[in-house]
Amino acid sequence: MNIILLGPPGAGKGTQAARLVEHHGMRQLSTGDMLRASVAAQTPIGIEAKGIMDCGELVSDEIVTALIDAELTAMGPEVGAIFDGYPRTAAQARQLDAVLAKHERKLDRVIELDVDEDELVRRIVGRYSCANCGAGYHDEFQQPATRGVCDKCGSIEFKRRPDDNEQTVRTRMAEYRAKTAPILPHYEARGIVSRVDGMAPIDQVTTAIEAILAED
């Protein structure tokens, strides 16, 4: 099975992808992660990409497609793929169709995690983590048992991501909607788009996704 998970930053795509990997033995294909790994390993694609990024330019769709092509080859046909946050443009959607066809795979389902923008801002702006072990917390939803002390390691040092602010979140939401709008009709015409309430509790989101996949 091959699926696409769509949703803005903070919608929970990574969490749900990790659960699909655990439950179904699928492979999560995050283009950002693949790009960083390719650069670190100094593969031919990684070397080319690094040269482009060092010049302050965006990596081309062709390089991203080549990364996906290489990953699908390494995976083998028996392993399902989860495309996390990709494709992001109509051109990328067409290129993904081509590379899947090359590997004799079909796209089974596109799942969009729907979120309320104001609630998403609240969710992201309030989050922080332990500077020592990385345990995640939230100002409203998940405080440490002892205020100011990490539950897992006892550290008293915490940190927040600099881009976890309202302006950045709303800008990313606007960008996501602008880019995703032309992608969805590409897949809706095939009848493979499903939407899940991304603001529901994590376990409920997982259950909803599993129910959708069980239909395919």
Regions found by a protein language model. Name each.
Residues 1-216:
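Glycine-rich phosphate-binding loop of ATP-dependent small-molecule kinases
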